[in-house]
């Protein structure tokens, strides 16, 4: 494909510009993109799509890709929850009207165990400031703070970049003066994967009702692996919260690895629910009196989830 053909495809297919890329480690970044269009009203916790053409370069060290004939002019897209850096400057929460960009928290997928070649993230990590990109004009999703009332306890449980929507939700809660306790748990493999750790530490110093709990499972020196499900079952989550888990006044938000979440399967004929194995957070919480959302029957519970996979 010639340079002129690539330039023409970019002109016709892209509608946003890369404002900044903050590479937190070789496989993790915070990406900000400015759309050509005015941002439509949306809610923290929702998502939109990012897209790049197959004609774009990929970073080195990723699974080898062989494109089928004709795919080189197509655009690959994926949905990403919107993230938020929460502060615009030390001690001052961001004001939405100050920014004209979307923020995304992205991990580089170098290869897939199932053999499917990662198409988008190796191209996203090859971007530079000023490059063009496609962003979906529609921000959507049901994973929002709508059911939360002031005074409710809010618990965010996320793995990896699944904390992205929780960052945005945290910003909204603190910005509107939420009086209930807020606990934000993020489980990652290594400490270097805690991309917003400094921000959360600063929030704890500024807001007495906010607690951040980072967990690492492969960090050298960690003698005991603690997964989110274990944290709930052992009672340690309540210790960190400083109170009991009361389903009547608590909302739990789960985002990340499907094995952590453990969404139950609903039998279409009988309506019976069955939990997957290994045990996920939904099963542990429902044993404590909580009830997960069931989209198929439009049931709104107090455990909400976004399968970020």
Show which residues each predicted segment covers.
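Histidine-anchored nucleotide/phosphate-binding helix
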Residues: 82, 165-175
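Generic structural signal for buried aliphatic residues
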Residues: 48-51, 133-135, 154
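Structural motif
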Residues: 153-155, 181-183, 251
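A short, basic/flexible loop-to-alpha-helix module at the beginning of a structural domain
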Residues: 137-149
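Ferredoxin-reductase
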Residues: 3-128
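Ser/Thr-glycine-rich phosphate-binding loops at phosphate-binding pockets of nucleotides
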Residues: 159-165
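Reductase modules of NAD(P)H-dependent flavoproteins
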Residues: 185, 190-309
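Conserved S-adenosyl-L-methionine
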Residues: 151, 173-182
């Amino acid at each position: 494909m010639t340079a002129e053909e690539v330039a023409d495809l970019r002109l016709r297919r892209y509608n946003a510009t890369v404002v900044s890329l903050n590479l937190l480690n070789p496989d993790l970044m915070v990406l900000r993109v400015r759309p050509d269009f005015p941002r439509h009203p949306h809610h923290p916790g929702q998502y939109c799509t990012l897209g790049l053409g197959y004609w774009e370069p990929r970073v080195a060290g990723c699974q080898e890709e062989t494109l089928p004939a004709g795919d080189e002019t197509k655009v690959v897209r994926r949905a990403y929850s919107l993230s938020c850096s929460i502060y615009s400057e030390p001690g001052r929460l961001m004001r939405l009207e100050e920014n004209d960009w979307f923020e995304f928290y992205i991990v580089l997928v170098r290869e897939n165990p199932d053999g499917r070649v990662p198409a988008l993230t190796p191209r996203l990590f090859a971007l530079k400031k000023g490059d063009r990109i496609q962003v979906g004009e529609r921000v959507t999703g049901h994973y929002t703070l709508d059911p939360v009332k002031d005074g409710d306890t809010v618990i965010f449980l996320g793995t990896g970049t699944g904390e992205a929507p929780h960052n945005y939700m945290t910003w909204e809660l603190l910005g509107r003066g939420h009086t209930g306790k807020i606990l934000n748990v993020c489980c990652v493999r290594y400490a270097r994967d805690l991309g917003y750790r400094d921000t959360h530490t600063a929030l704890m110093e500024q807001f007495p009702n906010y607690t951040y709990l980072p967990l690492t499972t492969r960090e050298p020196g960690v003698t005991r692996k603690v997964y989110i499900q274990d944290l709930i079952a052992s009672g340690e989550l309540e210790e960190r919260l400083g109170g009991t888990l009361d389903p009547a006044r608590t909302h739990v938000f789960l985002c990340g690895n499907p094995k952590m979440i453990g969404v139950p399967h609903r039998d279409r004929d009988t309506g019976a629910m069955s939990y997957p194995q290994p045990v996920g957070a939904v099963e542990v919480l429902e044993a404590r009196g909580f009830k997960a959302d069931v989209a198929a029957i439009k049931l709104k519970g107090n455990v909400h989830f976004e399968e970020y996979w």
